[in-house]
Amino acid sequence: MMDGFAQDWPTLTHTDNGLAMDQLGGDLPLDVGFEPQTRARSNTWPCPRPENFVEPTDELDSTKASNQQLAPGDSQQAIQNANAAKKNSSRRNAWGNLSYADLITHAIGSATDKRLTLSQIYEWMVQNVPYFKDKGDSNSSAGWKNSIRHNLSLHNRFMRVQNEGTGKSSWWMLNPEAKPGKSVRRRAASMETSRYEKRRGRAKKRVEALRQAGVVGLNDATPSPSSSVSEGLDHFPESPLHSGGGFQLSPDFRQRASSNASSCGRLSPIRAQDLEPDWGFPVDYQNTTMTQAHAQALEELTCSVADELTLCTQQQQQGFSAASGLPSQPPPPPYQPPQHQQAQQQQSPYALNGPAPGYNTLQPQSQCLLHRSLNCSCMHNARDGLSPNSVTTTMSPAYPNSEPSSDSLNTYSNVVLDGPADTAALMVQQQQQQQQQQQQQQQQLSASLEGQCLEVLNNEAQPIDEFNLENFPVGNLECNVEELLQQEMSYGGLLDINIPLATVNTNLVNSSSGPLSISNISNISNISNLSNLSNISNISSNSGSSLNLNQLQAQLQQQQQQQQAQLQQQAQQQQQPHQQHQQQLLLNNNNNSSSSLELATQTASSNLNARVQYSQPSVVTSPPSWVH
């Protein structure tokens, strides 16, 4: 054993490159390429580009390849060349740098007649693109087939042609007139469509028509948002107030912030400050006169009706109480602004020539508000009693064509006298007239109030005795007593009518075997007519006063008892001939005929019981329908 260890060790083995295996240790430096490389955890496409990547200049553009018409044998070579040209770059898709549109372009271009159906495009993808070779089944092909259909309809380089054969899919061909590159996105071109341009043109034409016609509308101060997109920010392009060009805005108008896409808030009609001062009086202040009568009329309108009555009587008594020569003093004038006083003194066309301060003026008189509804003549008589030359009714010159209404008759008459002698004579005459007028007014007022009260009372409560029952046409009145009684019972339920009709029912059952005579029918109809007339007369007689239900119930019971007695007498009179007739029939007929007769009598009696049964208080108004 030990001798084996003493032998020499085997020689070193050499590698292919002449280096011993032991020398491959730490003496030689390791290559940098063997170091571990960092890798992203996600394997999604596209892969991240390296840091030192430079895009090659001679790269094959997909847009150039998409519009090239390739030969059938060059399609695979073109794909390989495209992949080889971009082997250093990251791939856009899992199968390479070509998009779906590029693959479809190669597929259509590889066909002999330059057209393929949708199913043929699918087959070309599976056969020529390695990525889709194992994805041809229906389960794994749903996604990329949907993408192919989407690209066919989206890009303008593809054109759909109807197939000549029936039941076959359409052909897809390359559009020679298509622009190179990708088609313009439809969403980006939505703001510059022809419809938008037409709308702008229509709006401008409408504005020009308004400018020419000179129409001033309600919204003229604000510009139209549709037609002011291309206009400047400092002009009103839509204003029809100015026929030529845009209207330059004043600096009082401020602008609002807006975008280029929307023009709704370009110009604001809100003024920065108020341009017109508030003068505090109406526009026609130069022609108006604030008179004493107008001021007092406004004060009187705020008072109540009772205060107006007392003021009217007090003014009539105080206005002409100076029979002994002592004139009454007018009330102090109300406050007036200075400009109104000057306008009154300068421009009043109704003022008389300067009465002296010592002259007397009569107390103003107005028409009371309550006398407007009545035919009151207090104001008319007062105006007629005065001389027309001495009365001045002050009206506002701003309304020269207006006629004073009953509300505006609260004006006063300023009577200016010429001397003390005429004053005394006129005062005595007017005092007498005024006393007479006052008495007449009081009489008219009392009479009118009494008449109104009586009229109201007569309208509210008319006596029922005025209703004439004698002239009432009773003969033409049709009344169903049975329905009337049923209605009354359904409303109140106070009527309790008990009619013992057992004897009548038994007599009618016994006599029902024979036929009813015409006299019975006529008697029944007469009884019903009499009962109707009696009920009508009773109802009409009780209509003048309040209806008493107890009296009506008693009357109905009496009438029904009388009808029962009459029916019993008629049944007794007709019972004997019916019995004789029944005996003859029983003797002549056999057993079969007797049984049929019994059935007939039973049916007749049941029908009669059904017709003449008094389950509710009712009166027979017509013969039964089964009687012929």
From Swiss-Prot:
Region (Disordered): 39-77, 182-205, 217-269, 316-359, 389-415
Residue spans of biased composition, Polar residues class: 63-77, 221-230, 256-265, 402-414
Disulfide pattern: none
List of residues that carry Phosphothreonine: T44
Localization of this protein: Cytoplasm; Nucleus
Transcription as UniProt keyword: yes
Biased composition (Low complexity): 338-351
Keywords of this entry: Activator, Cell cycle, Cytoplasm, Developmental protein, Differentiation, DNA-binding, Growth regulation, Nucleus, Phosphoprotein, Transcription, Transcription regulation
Modified residues (Phosphoserine): S75, S190, S259, S262, S263, S268
GO CC terms of this entry: cytoplasm; nucleus
Any single Pfam family the record assigns to this protein: Forkhead
Keyword presence, Transcription: yes
Pro residues bias (residue ranges): 328-337
SMART domains (alphabetical): FH (SM00339)
GO molecular function: DNA-binding transcription factor activity; DNA-binding transcription factor activity, RNA polymerase II-specific; RNA polymerase II cis-regulatory region sequence-specific DNA binding
Known DNA-binding region: 95-201
Location, primary (coarse class): cytoplasm
Gene Ontology biological-process entries: cell differentiation; glucose homeostasis; negative regulation of cell growth; negative regulation of cell population proliferation; negative regulation of insulin receptor signaling pathway; regulation of DNA-templated transcription; regulation of lipid metabolic process
Quaternary state and interactors: Interacts with melt.
General function of this protein: Transcription factor involved in the regulation of the insulin signaling pathway. Consistently activates both the downstream target Thor\d4EBP and the feedback control target InR. Involved in negative regulation of the cell cycle, modulating cell growth and proliferation. In response to cellular stresses, such as nutrient deprivation or increased levels of reactive oxygen species, foxo is activated and inhibits growth through the action of target genes such as Thor.
Protein name as catalogued: Forkhead box protein O
Native species: Drosophila yakuba
